[in-house]
C-alpha cells in the first residue's frame, strides 16, 4: 500500500512534540512585542546618566544606548531598532522594574508635594489645630517658627501681597519631610 500524502508527517524523526505543547504566536503579536521593546529602548535612551546607572544593563546594551544618546535623526532611529533587537535577546523584566521604580519615585514626589501644599493651606486656615498635626508628624518641628510664618502668611493674604511666607511654610514642611525620610 502506498502512503497517503498526509502520512509522511508521521515519519518525521525527532517529532516527539505533541500538538497541544506548541504555542503558536501570530505575526501581529510578534510585531506588537517588537514595537513595545523599541519603545522601552527609547525610554531608556532618553534617561540621564544618573538614572541610567540605576538600570541593570550589560556592557553591550549600555554601549549601544550611550551611542544612541549621541546620535541624531535617522541614525538614532536605526540605533533604536538595534537596541530593540538587543532587548529581544535579553530578559527585560529587571530593566522594566528599574524603569518603573524611577518613574514611581517621581510620582511619589508629586504626591508628597500635594500633601505638603494641603497641609500648608490647613496651617494658614486652621492655625494651632494644624500645628498640632504637624508636631505629631514631625516632633522636631519648631512650633514658634511655624506660628510666625502662619501669622505673616495671613497678613500677606489680607494685604493682597505676594505669598512669601506661604512659600516659606511649604519649604519648611518639605525640609521636615526630607529630614524624616
UniProtKB/Swiss-Prot annotation:
Principal location listed in the UniProt entry: cytoplasm
GO BP of this protein: assembly of large subunit precursor of preribosome
Highest taxon, organism lineage: Bacteria
Subcellular location: Cytoplasm
HAMAP family: DarP
Family membership noted in the UniProt record: Belongs to the DarP family.
Name this protein carries in UniProt: Dual-action ribosomal maturation protein DarP
Amino acid at each position: 500500500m502506498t502512503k497517503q500524502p498526509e502520512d509522511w508527517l508521521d515519519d518525521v524523526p525527532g517529532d516527539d512534540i505533541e500538538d497541544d505543547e506548541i504555542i503558536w504566536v501570530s505575526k501581529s503579536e510578534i510585531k506588537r512585542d517588537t514595537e513595545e521593546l523599541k519603545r522601552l529602548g527609547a525610554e531608556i535612551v532618553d534617561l540621564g546618566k544618573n538614572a541610567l546607572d540605576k538600570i541593570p544593563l550589560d556592557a553591550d546594551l549600555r554601549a549601544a544606548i550611550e551611542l544612541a544618546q549621541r546620535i541624531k535623526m535617522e541614525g538614532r532611529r536605526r540605533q533604536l531598532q538595534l537596541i530593540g533587537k538587543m532587548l529581544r535577546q535579553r530578559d527585560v523584566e529587571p530593566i522594566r522594574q528599574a524603569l518603573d521604580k524611577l518613574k514611581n519615585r517621581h510620582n511619589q514626589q508629586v504626591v508628597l508635594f500635594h500633601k505638603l501644599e494641603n497641609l500648608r493651606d490647613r496651617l494658614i486656615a486652621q492655625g494651632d489645630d494644624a500645628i498640632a498635626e504637624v508636631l505629631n508628624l514631625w516632633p522636631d518641628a519648631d512650633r514658634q517658627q511655624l506660628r510666625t510664618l502662619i501669622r505673616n502668611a495671613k497678613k500677606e493674604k489680607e494685604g493682597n501681597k505676594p505669598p512669601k511666607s506661604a512659600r516659606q511654610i511649604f519649604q519648611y514642611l518639605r525640609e521636615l519631610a526630607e529630614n524624616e525620610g
